[in-house]
Amino acid sequence: MIIYRDLISHDEMFSDIYKIREIAGGLCLEVEGKMVSRTEGNIDDSLIGGNASAEGPEGEGTESTVITGVDIVMNHHLQETSFTKEAYKKYIKDYMKSIKGKLEEQRPERVKPFMTGAAEQIKHILANFKNYQFYIGENMNPDGMVALLDYREDGVTPFMIFFKDGLEMEKC
């Protein structure tokens, strides 16, 4: 299994269990997820080490809640955040500088294609700004990558967009 981590915050963003494809000329990765529902807080009586009490009233056990969301977000503990268009422009400008710095250290041949492609991709993001929900890694580092969540034309299938050069891969 391959875990994709944020190059700056080192937060886990997603893994290779999802359908992943390169978009924007290889600049970004599009990761397709699905909506899932999970029950949390429900504890099986057998795990407590006994049977339901014959003396107590019925249904007094543990409470459970059902949480529905996108599997990528839930599995990797991504945190939703929000941006105005102006705030996102400021964030993305600083983020691009950070990634450019990392690339200059680690992969200098990627600097020019990244900066050229990123400018185009950012124009596309800003043109479709209202369609996106924004997610950051579990540690909520404001300097880290902000992943974009959108839905396919069917309105049901979620997908997330990540800048490929802002990720590091870790084999497990």
From Swiss-Prot:
Cellular component GO terms, alphabetical: cytoplasm; spindle pole
Protein name: Translationally-controlled tumor protein
Gene3D superfamilies, per the entry: Metal Binding Protein, Guanine Nucleotide Exchange Factor, Chain A (2.170.150.10)
PROSITE patterns per UniProt: TCTP_1 (PS01002), TCTP_2 (PS01003), TCTP_3 (PS51797)
Transmembrane intervals: none
Its job: Involved in calcium binding and microtubule stabilization. Acts as a negative regulator of TSC22D1-mediated apoptosis, via interaction with and destabilization of TSC22D1 protein.
One Gene Ontology MF term: calcium ion binding
Gene responsible for this protein: TPT1
Sites of Phosphoserine modification: S46, S53, S64
UniProt cross-references to Pfam families, sorted A to Z: TCTP
Superkingdom, taxonomy of origin: Eukaryota
Region Required for reduction of TSC22D1 protein stability, residue ranges: 70-172
Domain TCTP as annotated: residue spans: 1-172
Subunit organization: Homodimer. Interacts with STEAP3. Interacts with TSC22D1; interaction results in the destabilization of TSC22D1 protein.
Cellular localization per UniProt: Cytoplasm
Keywords recorded for this protein, A-Z: Calcium, Cytoplasm, Phosphoprotein
Family, per entry: Belongs to the TCTP family.
